[in-house]
Amino acid sequence: MSPAELHADSIVIDGLIIAKWNRELFEDMRKGGLTAANCTVSVWEGFQATVNNIVASNKLIRDNSDLVIPVRSTADIRKAKEQGKTGILYGFQNAHAFEDQIGYVEVFKQLGVGIVQMCYNTQNLVGTGCYERDGGLSGFGREIVAEMNRVGIMCDLSHVGSKTSEEVILESKKPVCYSHCLPSGLKEHPRNKSDEELKFIADHGGFVGVTMFTPFLKKGIDSTIDDYAEAIEYVMNIVGEDAIGIGTDFTQGHGHDFFEWLTHDKGYARRLTNFGKIVNPLGIR
């Protein structure tokens, strides 16, 4: 079987996409043979703004039903493969949308959310992100983890601090993930994960999605597909082939204002980082 045949035969899932949703993007997903993806619908937004995002996303999926379908279960992913479409799984990059209401976890599950990152770079009511001194998982956070386990929402730790991540891994009764990360063994960066962190999540049944977001790759914006492949190989040698996948963190369609919003705490406060120029690795559109 050739690489192209293997790709065509496989169920291909992207661990995270935060691109601007439109028909052109959905067409690219079909051309690329993408079966399903974790698609971000909340970062800094609270409850109501996140519901509004989901309402808009639902309409976009309906209007492009020849290309995409909503994902509520693994059966929907298989259905997407059979129909030659891409399954859209809603995900959060921050538990901020739960506010201080444990009951909101189930509400969002019923709205189609299947994965939630516990923190986005900074402190919230659940725990601490990777750009702050890490105080660990809060008592409220433990209740949120338990409720996410109960209703079937996966805990994502990609932007989460090391101590909070470890405590979520130990607290969760179900597997958790780094949906989109890179190894600090190739480049030191607050967003990258150490060899020990990668091994710990894999040893506890978790999953690691390797991102191609160039600011975190070894050569930055000068990175190529070869550099991305090197990162995949590096992580696989630590976690094993059964615990590794891809989480591209694609951002197609977004402009300067979007990245300014992402890189300031709560979307407007202190600057957390400056990505500079955002490009995909050479060879990827």
Where are the regions that the model predicts?
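N-terminal hydrophobic targeting/anchoring segments and the immediately downstream early-domain regions
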Residues: 1-139, 188-285
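Histidine-centered catalytic micro-motifs
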Residues: 12-19, 160, 178-181
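Distinct, well-ordered alpha-helical segments
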Residues: 26, 101-105, 161-174
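Alpha-helix-loop-beta-strand connector modules within alpha/beta enzyme cores
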Residues: 61-63, 135-152, 168-178, 238
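A generic "binding-loop/recognition-motif" signal
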Residues: 122, 160-161
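Catalytic beta/alpha-barrel core
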Residues: 153-160
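Histidine- and/or cysteine-centered catalytic micro-motif in compact active-site loops
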Residues: 160, 181-183, 211-215
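A short alpha/beta connector and helix-capping loop motif
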Residues: 169-182, 263-271
